[in-house]
Amino acid sequence: MGDGERREDENPTTSAADDDDDEDYDEPGGGNHFLGFMFGNVDDSGDLDADYLDEDAKEHLFALADKLGPSLKDIDLIKPSAAPTDPSEQDYDAKAEDAVDYEDIDEEYDGPEVEAATEEDHLLSKKDYFSSNAVYASVNSKVSVFDEENYDEDEEPPNDNDLPSDNIVQNCTSASAEQLDMAPSNDNLAVEKMSSSLSEPEESFESEAFQKEMVAEEQLESKTATSLPVLCIEDGSVILKFSEIFGAQEPVRKAKMDRHKRPVNKELQITNFTDIVEEDEEVFLRSTIQNLSALKHIKTNDNFVESDSDESTSDVALRLKDSCLSEQPMKDKDIPTAVQSPVFPDFYPLEHENWENDIVWGNSPTTAIQPCLTSCAISKESLDDHNEDQAEGYVSGCWDVQNKFHSSSVMADPFGHTEIPDSTSYRSPENSYSPLRKETAQENNSLDEPNNITQPVKIDTTRHLNKLSLLNKELLEGSWLDNIVWDPSEDVPKPKLIFDLKDDHMLFEILDEKNGDHLRSHARAMIVTRPMKTSAVENVDHNNQAIALSGRFNISNDKFYSNRKMSQQARSHAKKRATMGLKLVHSVPAQKLQTMKPKLSIKEIANFHRPKAKWYPHENKLTARFQGDECSHGPMTAIVMTLGGKGVKFLVNAEETPLSVKSKASKKLEFKPSEKIKLFCSGKELQDDISLAMQNVRPNSILHVVRTEIHLWPKAQRLPGENKPLRPPGAFRKKSDLSVKDGHVFLMEYCEERPLLLANAGMAARLCTYYQKTSPSDQTATSLRSNSDGLGTMLAIDPADKSPFLGNIRSGSHQSCLETNMYRAPVFPHKVATTDYLLVRSPKGMLSLRRIDKLYAVGQQEPHMEVFSPGTKNMQNYILNRILVYVYREFRAREKPGIIPQIRADELPIQPPITEAIVRKRLKHCADLRKGPKGHLFYIQRPDFRIPSEEELRRLLTPENVCCYESMQAGQYRLKHLGIEKLTQPVGLASAMNQLPDEAIELAAAAHIERELQITSWNLTSNFVACTNQDKENIERLEITGVGDPSGRGLGFSYVRVTPKAPVSNSTHKKKSAAAKGTTVTGTDADLRRLSMDAARELLLKFGVPEEQIDKLTRWHRIAMVRKLSSEQAASGVTMDEIPVSKFARGQRMSFLQLQQQTKEKCQEIWDRQIQSLSAMDGNENGSDTEANSDLDSFAGDLENLLDAEEFDDEDVGNTDIRSDKMDGMRGLKMRRCHTQSQINEEIQDDVAEAALVEKLLEESDSDMKRKKQPVETTNYSTPMYNQGNKMKQGKAGQMIKSSVYAGALTPKESIPREAKEVENFAEGSLPSKLRTKTGFDANDDIILVKRKNIPGKDGFKEKRQGARGDTLVCGACGQLGHMRTNKLCPKYGEDPETSEMDVNSIRSHPPDIVSNAQIKTSNKRLVAKVSSEAFETEGPESIEKAKPVPVKFKCGAPEKSLDRNMSISASLVSDKRMMDATDSKSTGKVNKIKISNKIKYDDYPPDTPKPSVVIRPPAEVEKDLPRKKIIIKQPKVLGDQQRPTELRSGQEPRKTRKIVELSSFEKRDREDDNGFSGQPIQINSSHDRGWGLVGKRSKGIMESSESWRAFEEQRERQEQRLIEARIYDARREDELQKAKKKNKKKKKHEFRDDDLLDPRPYKNDRRVPERGRAAKRRTPADMTEYTPPAKRHRGGEVELSNILEKIVDHLRTMSCSFLFRKPVTKKEAPDYFDIIERPMDLGTIRDKVRKMEYKNREDFRHDVAQIALNAHTYNLNRHPHIPPLADELLELCDYLLEESADVLDDAEYAIED
């Protein structure tokens, strides 16, 4: 069954339709149907109903007279001599005499094609575009920067034979005509058909040689007709035709019965060729496809042009050079040779084409190759026309018609590049030919020389013959056999695309790639802006420019016809769009978000509107953790970093000088070696002639490069070349292009302090000017457009159109503005001072200077977009989309063959409130979370996941969304800066304010909070967009004037929304009480109708109305004026005794139109003032700043007093940073007093960012150079590492037993850097969030790491293991592992979280006037431990990072509680077991630089510097069953144990009374107990007994018998006794020191040193809000008064006295003697306490009274402190004799502090009395 028969069976419906078409062929007038279809006024006989055709139509019809039948011959269309009969001779380039050229018509049309052409032209005057030093050939050249811009200018290849820029329709028509005339057929029937249908051309294309070849071929075919079919004769051998022998042999049938039936998609049919009658369909199909294409084109081209079909259908005919097959839809391809693929994918036209004739045989006779050459020459001519059209930039037809057999997407490239889609089922004949090679082209070009053909047609023919003389490599190699389709159901594979650089028909884009130079040197045709295979998203980039691009190719000038047919509604929408402007196209880096950071630092957010740069290096202590030991020789790593943030790592020698380092860095940092630069290390400049080692440059140090030379850019105003695009998407394709090194620079200065929206680098903006016409015929805008200087795009506004701004532009004037996709803002030009230049610094530190072209002042923004509101779904979706886009782009960038892309989880820009769990769930569809070999988590791309295209990514996240989110972050930071953290919307604040008491301070604070929330960026933008989305119809819903005015002086608009029904205050109610009366007026003396003419006259005279004006008014006009004036004065609260204002006042209700008109008038007034203010060249802009800010300053003072006096017992600290704690401690308007705190935090952020960059650079190095060290993590406790002590070898040297806690605890307090805690926190960055400790110096951290347990009778220690649950639970109160804060077994269960604050304060508080040395017991045992303070000071930060597993099993006895200020090294050395074996000391190697000494040097231990000793016990005293290779590191007894009083043995005393006795110790032992609780607790009445019971219970689990337990109890009691004795001694010693101090007559101001209070005083930070499940955080001890500006007080001395007394109370609370008196005594601790004590008092109550400012003098304060001492003597004198001395000590210390502060207290008390 043949192919045609098979299709008949499959498509019976289509076959029937074709049979009907066959019947149409028999009709005599069949051609008239087509003519009637075209015009509709031609009858069946071919006569015209009315002769209304114009000359062009008659001319085209006359050209078709031979095809359309004899009926048209009788019509007098045109004179025969007027036009040639052959279409090929028609001069399509010549214009008719009456032709009107609409291409350059200047009509008033504000469409985008006009705007795009004029935007860049009017930014500057022509003289500004050229530099004085620039050389241009001719300013008046045809291609100028002032002409219409064209994105395709850079696409024109350097081809001298470019076609003239003509109409595409003319090109298509002429090309088709040439094809038709030059297409001889191989078959006689086809030749007859062509000759009968077309008129004879005057100039024949065929030469005499061609005719001879055709005759020879006909003779050869006639000879072999009766035998086998012969293709050609080569070397005497006959080559037969493959298709005739092996093809399907079918008898010759008539054309009517032998037509191949094909399915037709009725929906996509365009043309039905009913009048093409062929005698032999098979012969017709065997003819070249070019002939068929030309035949169809000449039949249908004019039809489509002249028809009334829609625009898209007409565009099909205009764009396609060759039409589709009969009754077939158009395909998704645009093959250059106009070959259209058949419908079916299994339809292969091999059997319907003489493909053998196209084979080029090297030695074949001339007669065999001539037909093929002729046919292919025609095809090549069409190809030339197509490629020349491409060179001109014409868009070829590539239509997105979906193929029903294949679903591959087709992308339409607007720059004319054709891409064969995957669904192509036909291989173009040209693709099978080998491209032209250089050597072949030279050989063939020599053929032209001897012939010397002068005719252009012959030259072209020879050129095509030369191109076709190549051999088919696929045919020679036999590879074409692999492409034969044997199975009809199998799709034809996609043809190969051969790139040949020597082929001038192939255009190559020169990208910035490595092979770019190679392409430039070898390609015959270039340069194309767009890539050959562009992505779908890059096509979307041109959608915004599609209208502008179509203006060049829109020959029909549709805009002039579409405007006339446009409806009124469409016209209004067009005006709105013209007013609002076009959507701008950003640069490629901005669209890819390359210019925007995923996460902004605090410094960037704080300075969001005024970014700050780093211009001078300073010491970064956070990077000290990466530095190595000092080395005097050998190689080391140095990181050279610029101030712009560019860092490069180098390998240098310690003996090298900075000069050699400069030479190494000169290449990578792009500066000349001779350039003068400076190197800084740790904030100090390095000398060039001294080695790095001599200048203390350590390994991994940062060397900052400061470049001092300034480069001048005198020619920076130059524009790019004329053939390059000036705006996106063609321009600014790389980040490096976004520079000010060339082009023009306009500086825009915003008048708003905090603009609502700010664009990032690379985002588009447009400068345009609106001109308000005086009349519809005003042409001033045209003159301004041609003579504009810095006006940008000129847009005219008709008098009936609305203004694009809130205010109206005056008639006849113009206003410039800056437009982006986010906002519109008016701009006002200013003159640039001659002394002003722009200083530019590159990321590599180069300084450059250039001129400034224009300077503008930007007015108030009118937003088009809403800023995200915090906590909303839109904000969360944005963060998730940002993470998704980041992951997708990273996956795409890391795609490599055989490698699955993966991303580290910690690299994702996760920001709150998004958590890792949400991110993991969101990325579940594209990536799997897996753990790497080193424990890092990675997101690995799923194998079945397809990365979205760039277009989808850009739609998912736009640059405008990033700007909105950054603006939200800046607004949130400002609220936090003001102390508003939880509120983001002012909803409900008005009703809440009504419930507040009638106090001015509280109402002012609430009003301030409400005002700050109203003027946030998200509220203002939301209000404006909501009120203006209907073309500013609801602008009256905005306040226009009020708190939202950014200027504060009436120069800006307030976008705060008016409250519909605001709560009316009492004062407002009183003011309008008169207006509320309505029904009680009638018939009384207040009735306005009863006013006579004279009475109304008298009232108006009293109101101040002129008498002349009154005389002109009638009675009712006078009454109306009386009502108006009375109502105005009553509403304003003005009263006049002589005028009864309230009687005639009436309530006024404005209509909607009146309200709208009033709002417009307000807007116009503000608009005029803004223009006048910002346009003024010289004016005192700050004249009224003092007046405007006076109210705010007064309010700020009142609010400060309120915040000082307000009581908040509990508040969250919220930050683990020392300096961040300082910032959080100063909330609200107190930031005014400590303005330097924000600068400190900005420095911290810079240091952290720099440290992160250093860490990244070091991580990228080899494994030997890595400094990625981590401290001993808390997770190591109770892990198998501690259980492998027997397996570790003792001989390893260089291992150190260190932890971040010890590094901080052992460092002397005087030398602790301010960033010590930051270093620790940075080191703990890898710890889990649950296990990260909040306090670096807290003893609780020591407990987590190490624990000492005492076993009576034994000196050895046993390990304690935890269960699985104990490893995961972390207590929020004490910070220990193994339980929760709600556990009753917790040592801090039921305690006030404030007590934990004292843990830190006590270890830091060592005032020199109170320090006492404990008794030193010098027994016969050796004291061997001595800690070098210098070692810990210098090696502390580094030691944190060098922590490694220790090759021995050890137990460290942590200081279970510090001994506060009395904890000295003298007391710490008290121990009866301090022996060390030399063997053990050698085996352990170097342990934290511990120095061993034979004797004690008392001078080495200053009394205020605690240095815990490290005791290494000899193995002789260790239990025998324990391994010998064990180091037991213990803290001394006095340091580690607690002083607990001996329990009274009288069994009659209640156990609860014992609680107070136990509290007499310096620190509570139960806080420091280890965490892994096991077993059931014993029954204990008090909490501290419970803590001791827990210790006993845990130890009991380790014991083997009850005897051990009893021994343990005895040992504990002995320890308590020793602790009590030491405590009593310390108390006596302190008393002696206090008395000695008092004897000193010279007053010495007490130093509040860093040991006492390291941080600034927390103004509310030490008051916490208890929350369940939140970890207790230590309060920030603070005293920064000497580093901060003096406090500003507005309520006299009460606040000052309160601050001084609060400081004294805080200092008392930090003292060890105050431990028992810090909080009230409860009945649980002492049941009979309140029966004896009538007036309880404690330091907590005193502090509360101080904060409430209840103390008016110091005597009242001291009286309460003395009450504490009196209560202590009354209750504890007989019960606990050691407690009263503590109270006396506290009172003495209070007297001392009061005496030290006597001067400031006198001033404060004097201010209170005044």
Swiss-Prot record:
Subcellular location: Nucleus
The organism of origin for this protein: Oryza sativa subsp. japonica
Coiled-coil ranges per UniProt: 1240-1260, 1627-1647
Record field: compositional bias (Polar residues): 421-434, 442-454, 1272-1287, 1573-1582
Gene: TAF1
Name this polypeptide is given: Transcription initiation factor TFIID subunit 1
Stretches for region Disordered: 1-38, 413-454, 1261-1291, 1493-1609, 1632-1692
Pfam family, one: Bromodomain
Sequence similarity: Belongs to the TAF1 family.
UniProt domain Bromo: residue ranges: 1688-1797
Gene Ontology terms, MF aspect: histone acetyltransferase activity; RNA polymerase II general transcription initiation factor activity; TBP-class protein binding
GO CC annotations, alphabetized: transcription factor TFIID complex
Presence of keyword Coiled coil: yes
PROSITE patterns per record: BROMODOMAIN_1, BROMODOMAIN_2, UBIQUITIN_2
